[in-house]
Amino acid sequence: AEPDDAIQKALSGFIARAGHHEISALARVALAEILRQKNPAEARAVALEAVERHPQSVGAKQCHNLVAQIEAKELAVATERTWAKPWPALHVTYRNIDRFHLRLVKADWEERLLEGKPYGYGIDQKDRERILSHPSIQEGTVVLPPTDDYRSAVKEVPVESVFGTETIDPGAYWVVCSHRGDFRERDNVVSATLVWVSRISAVNTTDYQSHISQHTGYVVDLESGKPIQGAEVTAWRRDQKSLPRKMVKQETTETNQDGQYTLKADSGQETVFVVSSALDGQIHHVLTEPERLWHRENV
């Protein structure tokens, strides 16, 4: 932006004239903050000079913090919620690391539901400790192109290049990622993503404008694309009376010949559905995203 260019020019001129004085360290903080978005490496160099020239100054301490932020390690991994053939990819956003490590860990989805956690996000410290205490089913390491410019980079990593997909049984798993091989949390970035290895896809078709309070959807075999008849669909609803508010297992139905299911809806109550079916001799499960349907009175 032009205002930033003018400020940058003014700050650079001030630093050139007053570089010997510790007040220039404050100018370097301001200049580094402007440069940070466009050129993190240059911003780091500007801030480091303040630290070296005037280490005891207020500006140098602020520059030290800025350098630490620019040098901070970043790792975020996103992937499809359901894994099936063709296997998806891991979408990796990273900075200041040259590799990361993965573990595939069995997830107790029913335990999470009973604790009132029907989703894979919102991992707290207790969850993280529990996940890291479980043995891994498989492990892998991904080498990344370096980010010498201190910018975030994105890389797509095929799941099949990391894990032996042919030996992964259907079920729920945590994909645990760490830039440290020992997965310890000190000086580390550890994340966990819940995935379902399953051929089942549950498609929500609930009409939220309808006056009929019911949840509807279809269950499809991802491999063949055909509807699954006889799949078991169980509703779990949020218990408003318990603290913390747990999910409670309630009624079950089966899909018809078109793969369709219908279950009653309790107005305003958060509901998820566990869908199960035997396919080629193996039981497959999948958990839907939470739904909430409000009853509409006839007008």
What are these regions (language model features)?
Residues 1-299:
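N-terminal, cleavable Sec-dependent signal peptides of secreted/periplasmic/extracellular proteins
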